[in-house]
Swiss-Prot record:
Its EC number is 1.8.98.1. The keyword Heme applies. Its cofactor is heme b. It is an enzyme of class 1 (oxidoreductase). One of its GO terms (molecular function) is CoB--CoM heterodisulfide reductase activity. Pathway: Cofactor metabolism; coenzyme M-coenzyme B heterodisulfide reduction; coenzyme B and coenzyme M from coenzyme M-coenzyme B heterodisulfide: step 1/1. GO terms for cellular component: plasma membrane. This is Dihydromethanophenazine:CoB--CoM heterodisulfide reductase subunit E. The gene is hdrE. It is a multi-pass membrane protein. Belongs to the HdrE family. The dihydromethanophenazine:CoB--CoM heterodisulfide reductase is composed of two subunits; HdrD and HdrE. Part of a complex that catalyzes the reversible reduction of CoM-S-S-CoB to the thiol-coenzymes H-S-CoM (coenzyme M) and H-S-CoB (coenzyme B). HdrE may be responsible for anchoring the complex to the membrane.
């Protein structure tokens, strides 16, 4: 079995996080996320359809019943005449967001770059986790986790910049376009500001460590705490916080589109 892979995150260079510590942080974030999703499923099961709204007094929904009802709507035959096949809805309406493209190409480009960047980075993290777990179980791979992490560095850069482009467009629209600015509420600013902070902190942490572009001449000894800050805020803002914020639309909207079979 290969030697333990060193992590970039830590309080100092000598106090780097271990695999167990990262697993504990990740587990906490996932548990908080799942608890929030159960609460949302219960509210949706009670008929709540808006963000930050609560069920009527005495009304209590069931998460399991909601999921059963939703799945029943997904697989049942369309009755409104314009339902699309599930595969078409998944690819064109959810992955490529064609409904937004029909309304506004610029808004579609913004949404798609944020969605593609975010979800791909999440998937790459999942692949890294799978490789590490495979090694922990003693299964031999043709590469070490450290080598695989190095292999993922280029796609991480590419999709990080794709995400950054989308976030910058979103920020500029909210600042420059009067209609968008006037319609924005504090939750919208927290949402886009949080994604911007997560994205930039990742580039800065990597830049300090490698000395490339985003390091801004900062002392290399700050690389571990910078990486730790990025790791923690990514886990809790981009995972744990989702069910309790307007981020929930990234889950609620695809569920609704699937249930409606692509219908408006």
């Amino acid at each position: 079995m290969s030697s333990e892979m060193a992590y970039f995150s830590g309080l100092t260079d000598a106090l780097r996080l271990t695999f167990v510590q990262i697993m504990i942080l990740s587990t906490i974030a996932i548990v908080v996320f799942l608890y929030g999703m159960i609460l949302n499923f219960q509210k949706w099961g009670a008929g709540v359809t808006g963000y930050a709204l609560e069920p009527q007094a005495g009304s209590k929904g069931s998460a399991i019943r909601f999921l059963k009802t939703w799945w029943g709507q997904v697989v049942e035959e369309s009755h409104h005449g314009h339902g699309k096949p599930i595969l078409e809805v998944l690819i064109l309406d959810i992955l490529f967001q064609r409904r937004i493209l029909k309304r506004s190409p610029l808004r579609w480009f913004m949404h798609f770059t944020i969605f593609a960047g975010w979800m791909t980075l999440f998937a790459l993290s999942g692949l890294m986790f799978a490789v590490e777990m495979t090694e922990k179980f003693g299964i031999e791979l043709p590469f070490t986790p450290a080598e695989f992490r190095e292999f993922l560095s280029i796609p991480n850069y590419i999709f990080g910049y794709i995400l950054l482009i989308g976030v910058l467009i979103a920020l500029v629209r909210r600042i420059v376009v009067s209609d968008v600015r006037e319609a924005s509420i504090m939750y919208d600013w927290i949402l886009i500001g949080g994604v911007f902070l997560v994205t930039i902190s990742g580039f800065v942490a990597d830049g300090i460590r490698t000395g490339i572009i985003w390091g801004f001449g900062l002392d290399p000894t700050t690389a571990p705490p910078a990486a730790l800050f990025h790791s923690v805020i990514s886990l809790f803002f981009c995972i744990a916080y989702i069910p309790y914020s307007k981020y929930i639309h990234v889950i609620a909207t695809p569920l609704a589109i699937l249930a409606n079979k692509g219908g408006e």
